């Protein structure tokens, strides 16, 4: 295996931020494992990477299912032999629901994807990075602006993103002995299909509705590549990237 070969895995790689990051990582020289539940969008991402002469592997998995995640990372280990970077990106929106109207099943569903899924994928990547030679690697967790300042009526989403920060810092501490770095990128208003509603208006801190500025998702993808390509002696523990005009600073 050439010493210069680099391997990455991206969860939620079939659309949005995950797709953009996977394509950018491939352009930066990484061979990329594309992880997601549905094969068709993953194959579309692989085709995009292939058109730019990149290499990718499609890995179908449900990040909220422990057995599925373990099988996915076993497939990655078998195909690549090692893993240098995990972009732990998969997550779901939860809309705006007043606390008194929250159903326990809805809460559990958000937690399963946004928190348990992050834990399961980080655990599998950590095991792989600890066992491989040379030892080490980097885990980049997708946090959110909501890891610092919540939007109204988003208690489940905000709670899971705050918890991701705890996962990031714990792995950054525990991984030191094994040359495993852990980072978090907190993203605000990247232009994807999930944020199209921002053009029409989203709830503000005072309860009013207003449109919000968005930024091109390629800026996020390029930021992920920058974090991923650092030597393991350096780590960006936290990065916040946001649309310049979005109401974040002071919104709480």
Model region roles, listed by residue range:
Residues 97-99, 106-108:
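Substrate-binding pocket helix/loop in short-chain dehydrogenase/reductase
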Residues 40, 60-72, 104:
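The beta1-alpha1 cofactor-binding region of Rossmann-like NAD(H)/NADP(H)-dependent oxidoreductases
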Residues 122, 160:
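Active-site helix of classical SDR
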């Amino acid at each position: 295996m050439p010493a210069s070969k680099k391997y990455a895995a991206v969860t939620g790689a079939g659309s949005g931020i995950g797709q953009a990051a996977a394509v950018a990582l491939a352009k930066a020289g990484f061979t990329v494992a594309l992880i997601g539940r549905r094969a068709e969008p993953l194959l579309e991402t692989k085709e995009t990477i292939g058109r730019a002469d990149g290499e990718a592997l499609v890995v179908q998995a449900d990040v909220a299912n422990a057995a599925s995640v373990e099988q996915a990372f076993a497939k990655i280990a078998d195909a690549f032999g090692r893993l240098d970077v995990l972009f732990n990106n998969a997550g779901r929106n939860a809309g705006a629901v007043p606390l008194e109207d929250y159903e326990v099943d809805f809460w559990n569903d958000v937690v399963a994807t946004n928190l348990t899924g992050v834990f399961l994928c980080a655990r599998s990547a950590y095991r792989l990075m600890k066992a491989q030679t040379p030892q080490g690697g980097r885990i980049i967790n997708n946090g959110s602006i909501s890891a610092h300042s919540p939007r109204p009526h988003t208690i489940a989403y905000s709670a899971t993103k705050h918890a991701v920060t705890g996962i990031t810092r714990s792995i950054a501490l525990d991984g030191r002995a094994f040359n495993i770095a852990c980072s978090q990128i907190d993203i605000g208003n990247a232009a994807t299909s999930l944020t199209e509603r921002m053009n029409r208006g989203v709830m503000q801190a005072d309860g009013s509705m207003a449109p919000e500025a968005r930024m091109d998702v390629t800026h996020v993808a390029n930021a992920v590549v920058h974090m991923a390509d650092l030597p393991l002696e350096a780590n960006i523990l936290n990065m916040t990237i946001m649309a310049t005009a979005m109401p974040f600073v002071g919104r709480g």
